[in-house]
């Protein structure tokens, strides 16, 4: 199962951590892992393009984390898009992805 931890301070996202594999299907055919990977990597790329200094991030096989250092409206919007997309995947595949907000 993919585990997503979203740390928030009221409505502001401080970090997003994604770990694990969905095991929906075998590697190369797993649409849940592929979808989550595309959301997370694309989101990190958007954050970097907007303001690389606003975040710290780590991204490797089966794990990604974004920590927000400096928030502004554009960074916040990108983070909201990432989380909305992840919640959409969770709605469709609740046995394979779990989102926890702290």
Describe each region flagged by the PLM:
Residues 1-31, 41, 45-102:
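N-terminal intrinsically disordered, cationic/polar leader segments
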């Amino acid at each position: 199962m993919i585990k997503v931890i979203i740390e928030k301070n009221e409505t502001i996202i401080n970090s997003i951590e994604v770990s694990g594999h969905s095991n929906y299907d075998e590697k190369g055919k797993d649409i849940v892992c592929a979808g989550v990977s595309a959301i997370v990597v694309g989101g990190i790329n958007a954050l970097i393009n907007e303001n690389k200094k606003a975040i710290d991030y780590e991204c490797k096989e089966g794990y990604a984390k974004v920590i927000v250092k400096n928030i502004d409206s554009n960074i916040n919007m990108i983070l909201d898009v990432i989380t909305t997309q992840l919640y959409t995947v969770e709605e469709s595949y609740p046995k394979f992805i779990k989102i926890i907000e702290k």
